[in-house]
């Protein structure tokens, strides 16, 4: 018997897949140019809709309609580096090989987690990968034919970072390298959020906020001044402006802080932690909302490379990524960022 209910199929959007609530679907299509999506009364109809053209994606998507998880397609783009990453785990389950390096396989499924309580892993078969990612949020997974590329995906290594910043590796290191004799122990969480009153309507007003925990004088609360007044654009700008301020403080103030950005935008989290690594400048400029995306990625890369370059100077070894948090779930920092975003939108 066909499964009945409400099923929202996204054939073209930020994440293709099947969703069982409108809000989940909306997050994938709102503000996305040329989005293709449709509501169905049965899971089988929604699945059939996805089987039409324009369904392919290099990334998999973990959705919540009956536990459906879309299998990622292979990428043959290979990114090589000198050192192997430290922050990932190979398979340990009894159904999988204990060592990827000894496994007789040319297929690697890399799962990168953007939340602290879920471990990043690499699998050598789709079945185990699918079981691991099912019903999990805040993660991204991708298929590779090269183990180093799969590891790079998790560790955040990119061949394009310096090109995106329009600076050579040597110039960046010469300009921003700190003395290794100094250790900085202070850390700070920065919560970012966007808001849009009347989101999706012609009269919508959007704003963004960033809450610097323990440093209220640094908080950001501004209206979104350009482009479509969508919640998605406001969330992008919130993280972008927070990164801009973080960069200014890292490069101008004597006391350095290890900042950690937290946002409830899965799109921004996955873009910065995972997806931008396969984009060059031309690809970035072709993305929806590129007027905000390009500076967002450039600012993120600068901060990330700064911490990488000076990792021995920071207590947490310079670890920096965008952490996804569940929105409207009682997290005081996230609620404060939401308040600042709404305050900014009210000034539009």
UniProtKB/Swiss-Prot annotation:
Q: Which residues bind Mg(2+) 2?
A: 193, 338
Coiled-coil intervals: none
Which positions does UniProt annotate for Mg(2+) 1 binding? 193, 235, 264
Q: Quick one: signal sequence residues?
A: none
Report the PROSITE patterns cross-referenced here: RNASE_H_1
Report whether Metal-binding shows up as a keyword of the record: yes
Query: Quick one: a GO biological-process term for this protein?
Result: RNA catabolic process
The chain positions of domain RNase H type-1 read: 184-346
Q: Which reaction does it catalyse?
A: Endonucleolytic cleavage to 5'-phosphomonoester
Q: Which UniProt keywords apply?
A: Endonuclease, Hydrolase, Magnesium, Metal-binding, Nuclease
Q: Where is the composition biased (Polar residues)?
A: 54-65
Origin: domain of life: Eukaryota
According to the record, the residues making up region (Disordered) are 54-81
**Sorted alphabetically, which Gene3D superfamilies does this protein's record hold?**
Ribonuclease H-like superfamily/Ribonuclease H (3.30.420.10), Ribonuclease H1, N-terminal domain (3.40.970.10)
Which GO-annotated molecular functions does the record name?
A: magnesium ion binding; nucleic acid binding; RNA-DNA hybrid ribonuclease activity
Q: Which GO terms describe its cellular component?
A: cytoplasm; nucleus
- Keyword Chaperone in annotation: no
Q: Which cofactor does it need?
A: Mg(2+)
- Remarks, miscellaneous: Present with 149 molecules/cell in log phase SD medium.
Checking PANTHER family in the record gives: RIBONUCLEASE H1
Protein family (similarity comment): Belongs to the RNase H family.
Task of the protein: Endonuclease that specifically degrades the RNA of RNA-DNA hybrids.
Protein name, as recorded: Ribonuclease H
Tell me what organism the protein belongs to. Answer: Saccharomyces cerevisiae (strain ATCC 204508 / S288c) (Baker's yeast)
**Biological classification of the source:** Eukaryota, Fungi, Dikarya, Ascomycota, Saccharomycotina
Q: State the encoding gene.
A: RNH1
């Amino acid at each position: 018997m066909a499964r009945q209910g409400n099923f929202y199929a996204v054939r073209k959007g930020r994440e293709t897949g099947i969703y069982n609530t409108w809000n989940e679907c909306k997050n994938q299509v709102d503000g996305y140019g040329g989005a293709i999506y449709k509501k169905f009364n049965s899971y089988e109809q929604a699945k059939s809709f996805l089987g039409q053209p324009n369904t392919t994606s290099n990334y998999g998507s973990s959705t919540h309609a009956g536990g459906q998880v879309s299998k990622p397609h292979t990428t043959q783009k290979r990114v090589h580096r000198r050192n192997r990453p430290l922050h990932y785990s190979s398979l340990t389950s009894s159904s999988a090989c204990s060592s990827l390096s000894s496994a007789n396989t040319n297929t690697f499924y890399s799962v990168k987690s953007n939340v602290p309580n879920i471990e990043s892993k690499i699998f050598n078969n789709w079945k185990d990968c699918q079981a691991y990612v099912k019903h999990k949020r805040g993660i991204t997974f991708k298929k590779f034919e090269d183990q180093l590329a799969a590891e790079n995906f998790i560790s955040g290594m990119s061949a394009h970072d310096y090109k995106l910043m329009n600076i050579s590796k040597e110039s960046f290191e010469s300009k921003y390298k700190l003395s290794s004799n100094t250790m900085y122990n202070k850390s700070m969480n920065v919560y970012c959020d966007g808001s849009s009153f009347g989101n999706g309507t012609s009269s919508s007003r959007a704003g963004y906020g960033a809450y610097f925990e323990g440093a209220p004088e640094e908080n950001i609360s501004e209206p979104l001044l350009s482009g479509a007044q969508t919640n998605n654009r406001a969330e992008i700008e919130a993280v972008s402006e927070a990164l801009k301020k973080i960069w200014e403080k890292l490069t101008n103030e004597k006391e350095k802080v290890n900042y950690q950005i937290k946002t409830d935008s899965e799109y921004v989290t996955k873009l910065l932690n995972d997806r931008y690594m396969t984009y060059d400048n031309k690809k970035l400029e072709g993305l929806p909302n590129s007027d905000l995306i390009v500076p967002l990625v450039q600012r993120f890369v600068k901060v990330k490379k700064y911490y990488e370059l000076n990792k021995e100077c920071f207590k947490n070894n310079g670890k920096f990524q965008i952490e996804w948090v569940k929105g409207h779930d009682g997290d005081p920092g996230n609620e404060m960022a939401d308040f600042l975003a709404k305050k900014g939108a009210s000034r539009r």
